[in-house]
A protein has these predicted regions:
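A structural boundary/capping signal
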Residues: 24-240
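Bacterial N-terminal signal peptides
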Residues: 12-21
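N-terminal secretory signal peptides that target proteins for export/translocation
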Residues: 1-6
Length: 240
């Protein structure tokens, strides 16, 4: 028989652990959601915008709570599936009446639609907030050879010299770039820089992504839509 004192001690430890988990989850929710962000989403996009923000934030916080570096592939799979199943592919001309438009994640989720850039942008910010380091992710402009058209995917590098995994809305399977012979990379970028992609996986850094006006416009609109916390790196990445 276990002494009663040990039982009480165990219960206290478990209760404290649960309280800490709940506190961390609450902090994550507060940082990526919050009353002010909900109100602004509703003012800009109505109730669908508010609900899209709430669902998105809760999903990402859940991924962050479950995040483990050695199980990063699971986070990639869940985030990739989340957007591939929630967004319908619609061209910019039909969706926004513009030849080319890069939507913010909130715009895409509110309208439940987007084109290739919109899938990638939403996955990029979601993965960073879920715990994946920014330097492992590159938004990559490619040519889709079978379709003979420009396309965009998200590349994940486990380390700088690795064969990146490709997150795509056309092919929902996450595969190494070496197995995506249907894609020819042109250039890539993230919040840390911009690269020209060469053959055999070689990349040449060419400076900052600030030269990409479409990217800078997305960042500005996210800020205007009250999504500044989604642009900030999580605390755990700032301390690395």
């Amino acid at each position: 028989m276990v002494p009663q004192g040990i039982n009480r001690q165990f219960v206290c430890v478990m209760a404290l652990s649960l309280a800490l988990v709940c506190m961390v989850a609450a902090q994550g929710n507060q940082r990526l959601l919050g009353e002010a962000m909900e109100k602004q989403a509703q003012e800009l996009f109505g109730e669908p915008g508010k609900q899209a923000l709430v669902q998105w934030a809760r999903f990402v916080v859940d991924q962050g709570d479950a995040y483990q570096v050695d199980k990063e592939r699971q986070t990639l799979e869940k985030v990739n599936a989340y957007f591939n199943t929630r967004l319908e592919f619609v061209s910019d001309a039909s969706h926004w009446q513009k030849e080319d438009y890069w939507a913010t994640p909130l715009e895409s989720l509110t309208t439940q639609a987007g084109d290739c850039e919109d899938y990638v942008i939403a996955k990029y910010f979601s993965l960073i907030q879920a715990g994946v380091e920014q330097n492992k992710l590159r938004i990559t402009y490619v040519k889709a050879l079978k379709l003979n058209q420009a396309h965009m995917v998200l590349a994940y590098y486990a380390d700088p010299s690795s064969d990146p995994l490709i997150l795509d809305n056309i092919n929902p399977r996450i595969l190494p770039a070496s197995k995506r012979r249907d894609l020819a990379p042109v250039y890539s970028f993230n919040g840390m820089g911009m690269w020209i992609e060469r053959q055999q996986g070689r990349s040449i850094k060419v400076g900052s992504a600030s030269r990409l006006s479409m990217w800078m416009d997305v960042l500005l609109r996210m800020e205007q839509q009250g999504l500044q916390p989604w642009l900030d790196l999580p605390d755990r990445q700032l301390t690395q």
